[in-house]
Amino acid sequence: MQKLRTINLTKIMLLLLAVVGCTGQSLFVSYNMTICYVATLLGVIILIIRKKIEKIEGIHIWFLLVTIYIGGSILTSKFSIQTTAYFRLFLCIELVFLIGLKEEYKLYFINLCKGLASIVAISIILEVIIPDLFTEYFWFIATPKHDMGVLATLSKNIARGYYSGFACEKSAAAYIMNIGLACIGAEYFTNEKMKKINYIWAMLYLVGILLTGKRMLLAIPIVIYIIALLSLKKKNKITTILGSIILGIAIFYIASNAIPQLGVTFQRFSMYEDDTLRGRDNLWLYALALFKTYPFLGVGYGAYNKMASMWGLTTGDGIAWSTNAHNIYYQLLAETGIIGTCLFVFLFVIGIVTTIKKIKMFNRNDYKPILLFSLFVQMITLLYGLTGNPIYTVNELIMYGISLTFIAKCTLEKK
């Protein structure tokens, strides 16, 4: 009975975290922190029932050091409320480490992510067919309080050819499509083949990214795919790459004739003025200025927006800045100083290195997709971190943290 209760609570906890990680800026966004707190409470209950915690070792040590550092920095943070909120999220992930997820739970979480990504992909396609799907018919998914500003932003994006579907924000939607591709890719590179239905899902995820207009989040899965082919596939690497390019071009040509909006992303690649780097250099300058002023401890994790706004950073309408530095590395320097940034960089590097080592060390196919999923999510996070805010958005921070827990507790048969 005790074991059954633990199993059910663990699955509920993972379901809640998957909902946070893979639903974007939809109606759940207002409750993301609350959902994470409930998941944290469930984690505590699970540990109490089990009366034991997992051994702290490997990547867990580095994550714990980062968590302790963020917790300690609350005392020196210029805006402790923001730092405290993020600290609670890190504690939530820390509890998942302490619980020590078994293989079945990790596969369960991956399947949840794939299911949610599929829902978002289908909703993006539906939004192309019915442009006012989430601004008129299902507006409560985008904004339960019927915020006209949110609906106006969605309408403006749709008018420009940028779709986000159920995720209700183009960057969030493109990120979720990347997670869907990570699920599919983990299966493919485990067996060098996959179910036919998953080829269809892979195409839908790619189409979903194209319809969001987010170039960086389109480039990332392509880069990861090529790297994975060169390093993981055992034979016909070049042939597979060339075949994938030809097939991709053919599919895009056919699909773009049926859905003209697919061309928006590629049109934006050729535009000089765009939102990949436009204005970001200014955000980075503020981050570097904060780092120079507070070089050792920084201004506090999550405090960039408040501090930069105090120093004069605003939107074009003169509203205080609220969407971070669009580069996690510059922002870490500003918020955690040289000490905290070093801890994070060690966490990033050791996470990738440890995952690759375990992929090579263990040969059980039923565990390999878990490690590959973890590797792909980590790579998405670190690459997207060059122009985005993946460790500052609740959804994406949770996904990155969970991916790290996946490389802990590996008790597999060695080669």
What is each of the regions a protein language model found here?
Residues F63-I68, F79-L101, N111-A117, I124:
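Aromatic-anchored transmembrane helix interface
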Residues I110-P144, G149-A159, G165-S231, M379:
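Alpha-helical transmembrane segments of multi-pass inner-membrane proteins
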Residues I122-D132, L232-M271, L288-T293, Y301:
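A membrane-periplasm/extracellular boundary helix in multi-pass inner-membrane enzymes
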Residues S270-A289, T293-T336:
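Long extracytoplasmic/lumenal interhelical loops at the membrane interface
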Residues G58-I61, S118, I197, I222-L230, ...:
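Hydrophobic transmembrane alpha-helices and their immediate junctions
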Residues Q2, L15, Y37-K52, N178-T190, ...:
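Hydrophobic, aromatic-rich transmembrane alpha-helices
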Residues M1-R50, V66-T76, T381-L383, I402:
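N-terminal signal-anchor transmembrane segment
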Residues L41-V44, L372-K415:
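Transmembrane alpha-helices of multi-pass inner-membrane enzymes
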